[in-house]
Amino acid sequence: MQIVNISAYKFVSLNDIETLRPEMRSRCEDLELKGTILLAPEGINMFLAGPRESIDGFMAWLHADTRFADIAPKESLSDNQPFKRMLVRAKKEIITMKRPLIRPEEGRAPSVRPVDLKRWLDQGHDDEGRPVVMLDTRNDFEVAVGTFDNVVEYNLTKFSEFPDVIEARKAEFEGKTVVSFCTGGIRCEKAAIHMQEVGIGHVYQLEGGILKYFEEVGGDHYRGDCFVFDYRTALNPNLEPAGPKQCFACRAVVTAEEQQSPHYVVGKSCPHCVGRHDQAAA
């Protein structure tokens, strides 16, 4: 049976999480869905997987709530269920930045559609003639799997490092158009809002993130694959599972070439961590 995988988020004020959480969990369990839903005062972030009729049933139920009526999930298909259980969690933030919460009532960050971004990258500037800077807001191990050409990235180990890094370097973006991007849109939207707040003038988020870019325009101006947080590890520009895998011992991304190493033992070690294991055992 083919499994439909969806991801979606929305920054929207939620003040009824104690009621919403059990309702969502019950609905997902009734539909035999698996995955994770995060609820916070600033919004919702969800990753779900299940049969087509179950996914459609949940989205119809969700859209009946006017706060979520415009949520449009990104989809991909797999032969297996990528999640082991169904979790609905209450959090302080739907993506952790450890800065003041997003205020949804003040509006979203400006966004650029994938087709428009491709045009900018094709022509070498935005529609007003400003140079375009592609800013990767993901963690370093995700960037290693694939990213846009000529990207700016800061070797982040966690997203909460982003504010301090960007505030120290904001002068580098003067006179340029900055397009922040991430896997599905949530981190780059929060990053874009923060950049506006610290005075960076021309900031956009990539609408729908890398996965939406793949879906609408393919892999132009992008090199490699896109890391995803489930058993597939990475998707190529055709939104198909790609070669890299994740080491369950150290969480490093293991390329197809590295998987040929004798140090790569599924569930035990990989070339990135085998030496550390040996030292720990000594």
From Swiss-Prot:
Transmembrane portions of the chain: none
InterPro entries cross-referenced by the UniProt entry: Rhodanese-like_dom, Rhodanese-like_dom_sf, TrhO, TRHO_N
Protein EC: 1.14.-.-
GO process annotations (BP): tRNA modification
Residue positions of the active site: C182
Originating species: Cupriavidus pinatubonensis (strain JMP 134 / LMG 1197) (Cupriavidus necator (strain JMP 134))
Stored SMART domains: RHOD
Known role: Catalyzes oxygen-dependent 5-hydroxyuridine (ho5U) modification at position 34 in tRNAs.
Gene of this entry: trhO
Domain called Rhodanese: residue spans: 128-222
PANTHER family associated with the record: RHODANESE-LIKE DOMAIN-CONTAINING PROTEIN 7-RELATED, THIOSULFATE SULFURTRANSFERASE/RHODANESE-LIKE DOMAIN-CONTAINING PROTEIN 2
Protein name, entry field: tRNA uridine(34) hydroxylase
Catalysis performed (reactions): uridine(34) in tRNA + AH2 + O2 = 5-hydroxyuridine(34) in tRNA + A + H2O
